[in-house]
């Protein structure tokens, strides 16, 4: 939030230095990130009047000017071609440091003294100006010679860049910051004159307003202004807007932006003649509707988007951006002003959906109270009247679902003291709260308060305790007796065991080329359908949030898959076609629904890849690496997860406890289609709580054998139901002490093998630590492998090398 010192002074008399003001705001919770002096590049720059221009004696393209700078006449040599005798211009004097980096000193140009320099707009850093912009800036002749240029251009303000916290939307305005300073300094807020003149006509004869969705639009106000004169705003208004980073457009648009910054109330202006039926309808959008907005982009409208419409079409995406089909233009004769309060969750959802965020959006997302439109409209009409910008039709249409009223609340002093750890005198509590506009009185242990509508963040003792301490001053804790801490036990901080496990595995995944992501642990109900979850299963039974921020985030997740697949889809849509992602997070399983006790929270690690070189065995290798340091024996079985490919996925099962540690494999093709991701997507998730409970394996160092190893390849034919894991486990047991390693390198299917049959080719390595293996010993081992495979798994030899 950007405010200026002079603007604040319209509401409160401040004699504190900018640095002191910044300190007060920062110490009370509104951190001032930067103080900018507008005149930082305008010091030693004054208004000058050119008295005489003569040709340079030694240069055809230079002229010598005698310039009145107020207290004296000085000489300046220039090559500018747009200056004339009698012109009023900005003159930078020795010692000036201009916006473009030029430092001004006395000098000579081709032998003639030049005691300063005329300035252009760029050299002064000016962005908005009445007059000639090419070459040297030509100023208004009414300006007095010697006047500091910062004063002449109304660029002598001090700008504060303030980081307003999310719970304080009332501070997203000049008046909001002024209220804070009033409480901090004890100086009263000045009463503002918001009066305006109207004609004798009735606004209802010009316009009708219908709010269909009062839940998403609890208040909508509209007024009509006739005989509008579209022109530049006066200099003071444009200077204010420029100082807070807003580009002036014209008087009507500038008024809406001025009210936005001054009172925090977003406003919009329509061209009355382009509103079909001279009617405004606030409703949900309809599928098939489209609107082209002020950024010249077109957006499809759907039923989840709140729109402001005329009788036939959307004219505004509510709370975000207006449409080109009804905006104020140079020929506008009659305008409609809008001031409204929209549901912040709805605005946030729509803003994310279309990818548009404006200053208005920022306010609505934090929350605009239901009283704000009334004050904003008054100020807008006051400015119309003050600037003579048009004729205001009598009356304001006001559709409001509930009358804005302050809240009567009670707070406990003893509970506040317990929260703060200190006792604040009752008279100080009353002084603080009353200065904040929270009219209060104390009776015994109870504070009776009347909380203003704009302080929607105050709900309980903790909130009021925060208000008291931030105004009382956190430095009070510096004087508290530290003796109770003298005998405190000091402990060494370290990661929780689960966090240690998560950190270890995350770093290993980084080594495999995985980027960590952080996703929401809440999701929409359509996840159940998109992930093919079956009703009344552990994954299907999700907890519904009582007060969701949006319909898209109304359930608590039972699997990490949805968030991961959504992130993959988002990356693919942005032409990122080859990547690996991981996430550590929690899933939540209710003991029963509806929820009667806290759910089970399970820490999970998930990772996924759309890399074209990754496959089932790549993931199997990664799993083996991640689990190699744990005392764990596990087996693989076909995965039962509905969103995994039934034939190219596996559950990891602890052989001792039969617990499922995790799952990995290819994502089900239907799920890939539902999320609009590649079919070549592989996904894995591991239960971090189970892994953390495992003992770490003690690694034993084995001597390298002095004798050569023997490699053999076998291909067998077996039933489709036989897994690779079963085959390799059988090979390992058959080899006994001679076993070193084994791996599958081919799986083959054909009609010749028979129905429901497959060929699996694998290699294995034999080694002895005592001697060189003989052919007889090798053949005996191979025969034992074939015999065990046949009798245990029904597999027969296809070929042997």
What are these regions (language model features)?
Residues 1-201, 336, 353-355, 359, ...:
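Phosphate-backbone binding interfaces of nucleic-acid-interacting proteins
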Residues 2, 19, 435-441, 448, ...:
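A carboxyl-terminal module marker
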Residues 5, 63, 189-289:
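Glycine/proline-enriched, intrinsically flexible loops and inter-domain linkers
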Residues 39-43, 196-199, 490, 519-538, ...:
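Beta-rich nucleic-acid/ligand-interaction surfaces
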Residues 47-77, 239, 250, 256-325:
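Conserved mixed alpha/beta core segments that line enzyme active sites in large multi-domain catalysts
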Residues 110, 114-125, 133-137, 150, ...:
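Mobile "lid/hinge" segments at catalytic clefts and subdomain interfaces of large enzymes
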Residues 176, 409-579, 712, 765-767, ...:
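Extended, well-folded interaction surfaces typified by the phenylalanyl-tRNA synthetase beta subunit core
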Residues 185-211, 388-416:
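Terminal amphipathic helices with adjacent charged low-complexity linkers/tails
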């Amino acid at each position: 939030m950007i405010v200026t010192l002079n603007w604040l002074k319209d509401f409160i008399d401040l004699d504190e230095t900018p640095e002191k003001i910044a300190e007060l705001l920062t110490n009370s919770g509104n951190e001032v990130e930067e103080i900018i002096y507008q005149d930082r590049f305008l010091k030693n720059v004054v208004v000058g009047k050119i008295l005489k221009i003569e040709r340079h004696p030694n240069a055809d393209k230079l002229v010598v000017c005698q310039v009145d700078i107020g207290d004296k006449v000085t000489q300046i040599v220039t090559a500018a071609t747009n200056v004339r005798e009698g012109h009023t211009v900005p003159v930078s004097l020795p010692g000036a440091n201009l916006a473009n980096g030029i430092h001004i000193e006395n000098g000579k140009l081709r032998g003639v003294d030049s005691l300063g320099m005329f300035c252009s707009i760029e050299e002064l850093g000016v962005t908005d100006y009445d007059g000639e912009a090419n070459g040297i800036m030509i100023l208004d002749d009414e300006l007095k010679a010697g006047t500091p240029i910062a004063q002449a251009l109304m660029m002598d303000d001090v700008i504060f860049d303030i980081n307003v916290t999310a719970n304080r939307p009332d501070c997203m305005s000049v008046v909001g910051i002024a209220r804070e300073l009033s409480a901090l300094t004890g100086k009263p807020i000045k009463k503002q004159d918001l009066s305006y003149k109207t004609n004798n006509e009735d606004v209802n004869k010009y316009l009708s307003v219908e709010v269909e969705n009062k839940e998403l639009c609890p208040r909508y106000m509209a007024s009509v202004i006739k005989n509008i004169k579209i022109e530049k705003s006066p200099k003071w208004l444009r200077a204010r807007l420029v100082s807070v980073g807003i580009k002036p457009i014209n008087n009507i648009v500038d008024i809406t932006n001025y009210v936005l910054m001054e009172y925090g109330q977003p406003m919009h202006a329509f061209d009355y003649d382009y509103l079909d039926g001279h009617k405004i309808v606030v409703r949900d959008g309809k599928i098939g509707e489209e609107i082209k907005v002020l950024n010249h982009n077109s957006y499809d409208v759907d039923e989840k988007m709140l729109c402001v419409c005329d009788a036939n079409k959307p004219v505004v995406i509510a709370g975000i951006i207006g449409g080109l089909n009804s905006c104020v233009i140079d020929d506008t004769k009659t305008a409609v002003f809008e001031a409204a309060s929209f549901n912040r969750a709805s605005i946030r959802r729509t803003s994310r959906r279309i990818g548009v965020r404006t200053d208005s959006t920022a306010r609505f997302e934090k929350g605009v109270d239901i009283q704000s439109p009334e004050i904003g409209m008054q100020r807008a009409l006051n400015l119309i009247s003050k600037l003579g910008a048009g004729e205001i039709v009598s009356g304001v249409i006001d559709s409001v679902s509930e009358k804005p009223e302050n809240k009567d609340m009670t707070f406990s002093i003893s509970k506040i003291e317990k929260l703060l750890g200190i006792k604040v005198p009752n008279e100080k509590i009353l002084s603080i709260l009353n200065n904040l506009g929270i009219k209060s009185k104390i009776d015994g242990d109870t504070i009776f308060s009347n909380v203003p509508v704009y302080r929607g963040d105050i709900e309980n003792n903790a909130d009021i305790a925060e208000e008291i301490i931030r105004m009382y001053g956190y430095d009070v804790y510096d004087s508290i007796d530290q003796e109770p801490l003298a005998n405190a036990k000091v402990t060494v901080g370290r990661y929780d065991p689960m966090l240690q496990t998560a950190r270890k595995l995350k770093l290993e995944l980084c080594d495999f080329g995985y980027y960590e992501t952080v996703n929401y642990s809440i999701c929409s109900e359509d996840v159940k359908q998109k992930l093919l979850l079956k009703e009344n299963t552990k994954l299907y039974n999700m907890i519904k949030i009582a007060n969701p921020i949006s319909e898209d985030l109304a359930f608590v997740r039972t699997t990490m898959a949805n968030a991961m697949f959504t992130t993959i889809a988002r990356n693919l849509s942005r032409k990122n076609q080859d990547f690996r992602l991981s996430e550590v997070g929690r899933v939540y399983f209710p003991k029963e629904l509806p929820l009667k006790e806290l759910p089970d929270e399970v820490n999970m690690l998930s990772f996924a890849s759309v890399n074209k070189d990754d496959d089932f065995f790549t993931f199997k290798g990664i799993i083996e690496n991640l689990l190699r340091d744990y005392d764990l024996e596990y087996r693989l079985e076909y995965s039962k997860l509905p969103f995994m490919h039934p034939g190219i996925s596996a559950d990891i099962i602890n052989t001792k406890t039969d617990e499922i540690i995790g799952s990995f494999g290819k994502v089900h093709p239907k799920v890939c289609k539902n999320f609009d991701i590649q079919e070549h997507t592989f996904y894995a998730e591991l239960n971090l709580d189970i892994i953390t409970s495992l003992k770490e394996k003690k690694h034993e160092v084995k001597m390298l054998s002095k004798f050569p190893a023997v490699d053999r390849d076998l291909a067998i034919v077996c039933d489709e139901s036989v897994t690779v894991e079963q085959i390799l486990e059988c090979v390992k047991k058959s080899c006994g002490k001679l076993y070193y390693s084994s791996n599958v390198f081919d799986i083959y299917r054909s009609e010749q093998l028979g129905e429901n049959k497959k060929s699996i080719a694998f290699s294995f390595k034999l080694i002895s630590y005592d001697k060189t293996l003989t052919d007889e010993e090798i053949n005996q081992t191979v025969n034992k492998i074939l015999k065990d495979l046949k009798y245990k798994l029904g597999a027969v030899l296809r070929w042997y090398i």
